[in-house]
């Protein structure tokens, strides 16, 4: 809660700094810059006695003219001393701001202070009232609800660029606290957009969502706007979401409502627009995060696929058996079995029926260790069953 201070001059409303300063200069002087005539001395010819040559503040070039202009302890060409906006030559007075010169008309149009209430210009000699960064005329420094002029020592609140006295601010606070969050934040249809919270004298039939919850709480008054009133409010909202006091008074006169109802409708409409913008921003951020996550996953999968190179197919090598590597003589019918001691351990001879695999040979794959099925079957067919061969050898032994 701020307390209004006394009126002050406009010159004391704005701080002065090295980068943001405004100064009216009345003393534009024209000085005679005489040219040296007559025979030059030896010092001038050698450069030791060369006179100091002025430099123009505007174009930063040396001034070789006979006459020059002096402004604020700086030198200017006559053609460079002109307004930065209208390019009009400055002869008697000028305004200096941010190292630029302006005429009086352009300076007031660009940098003159404006009243935050009526948006009109404030004269430099006029007393003003200031609230934070806002400057008001003495007559415009009043409450936007009761239109009571605020004076020195009055407590007020600056809310969304609008001035409220202490009593109206407390009434609005109590009124807004009685509204449920769902009603104030939810986005309604066009018919429900016209429902605003009026003053005490404008009570209409309407039921709130929380009227039955607390019997001690009074029923919340509502105002149902017509289609024409709603269109007028929306058209004004498209032009400016924060209309000034004159615009609100005009809308109230056109629609037949109070200024307070108009102000509350604009407050609710601004809250709805902020919520819609916030929801849209959240949806965009969620979509962007999902899209980014999908791109990251696809990039990871591509990296995993490229990091593993396919293995070369194993070269299958089949060990073929040579028919001449083993003999079939021991398996012939009617042969005498071995009679020497120890021969019964090798009844079929010392020749191995399988090739001896060289120890230096490297096996490139697991398939090198196995024989082809067709080769094994053919070998078994040629060799025969060893048990049958034993029976035949036994019968031939006892028969002899």
Swiss-Prot record:
Superkingdom assignment: Eukaryota
DNA-binding region ranges: 218-277
Keyword terms of this UniProt record: Activator, Developmental protein, DNA-binding, Homeobox, LIM domain, Metal-binding, Nucleus, Repeat, Transcription, Transcription regulation, Zinc
InterPro entries reported for this sequence: HD (IPR001356), Homeobox_CS (IPR017970), Homeodomain-like_sf (IPR009057), LIM_Homeobox_TF (IPR050453), Znf_LIM (IPR001781)
Subcellular location: Nucleus
Single GO BP term: mesonephric tubule development
Region: Disordered, residue numbers: 176-226
Gene Ontology molecular function terms on file: DNA-binding transcription factor activity, RNA polymerase II-specific; metal ion binding; RNA polymerase II transcription regulatory region sequence-specific DNA binding
PROSITE patterns from the UniProt entry: HOMEOBOX_1, HOMEOBOX_2, LIM_DOMAIN_1, LIM_DOMAIN_2
Domain LIM zinc-binding, chain residue ranges per copy: 56-106, 115-168
A Gene Ontology cellular-component term: nucleus
Function: Specifies dorsal cell fate during limb development.
Name of the protein: LIM/homeobox protein LMX-1.2
Organism: Gallus gallus
